[in-house]
Regions:
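Sec-dependent N-terminal signal peptides
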Residues: 4-13
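Intrinsically disordered, low-complexity segments enriched in glycine/proline and serine/threonine
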Residues: 5-6, 20, 70
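Sec/Tat signal peptide C-region and signal peptidase I cleavage site
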Residues: 15-21
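Extracellular adhesion/carbohydrate-recognition regions
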Residues: 21-61, 100-102
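An exposed tryptophan-centered "aromatic clamp" motif
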Residues: 49-59, 65-119, 126-128
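Residue-level detector of bioactive/disordered segments in secreted/extracellular proteins
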Residues: 13-15, 26, 42, 57, ...
Length: 128
């Protein structure tokens, strides 16, 4: 009986680990303040293109505006993304471009949504 229970416990651990969405090596996991989803923020700032690769390396994807900001109203201003008001004082990239040279970014403490140039290395990757 003990062997059967031990085998079931091992199987459960393997299944639980394999169902996990990805890793967060070189980053910090956090929960969305509104939706409770798990995100991974890089420990290093990087440009927009590098953010895609960093998330892919984690087995995840660079989060879109819809994944970051529930019920976004299309406006770029303060407090439009309460889901990202998580006290990590940093700007983060979204996967959404805005025009030819810009991408949407979100401040992880104020919930402010703005745009930044693709090449700027002052924002962090946030993966979903």
């Amino acid at each position: 009986m003990k062997k059967i229970l031990f085998a079931l416990l091992i199987c459960f651990c393997i299944v639980a680990k394999s169902s996990y969405a990805g890793t967060c090596n070189g980053g910090v996991e956090f929960q969305g303040a509104v939706n409770g989803h798990t995100y991974c923020r890089s420990n290093s700032a990087m440009n927009w293109w590098t953010s895609f690769g960093w998330c892919k390396k984690q087995g995840r994807e660079l989060a879109s505006i819809d994944q970051l900001c529930d019920n976004w109203n299309g406006v770029s201003s303060d407090n439009v993304c309460p889901n990202m008001m998580v006290a990590l004082d940093a700007w983060s990239w979204s996967s959404n471009p805005s025009g030819t040279y810009l991408a949407f970014s979100v401040n992880l403490s104020s919930g402010k949504l703005d745009m930044a140039h693709y090449r700027i290395t002052g924002a962090y990757a946030v993966c979903y």
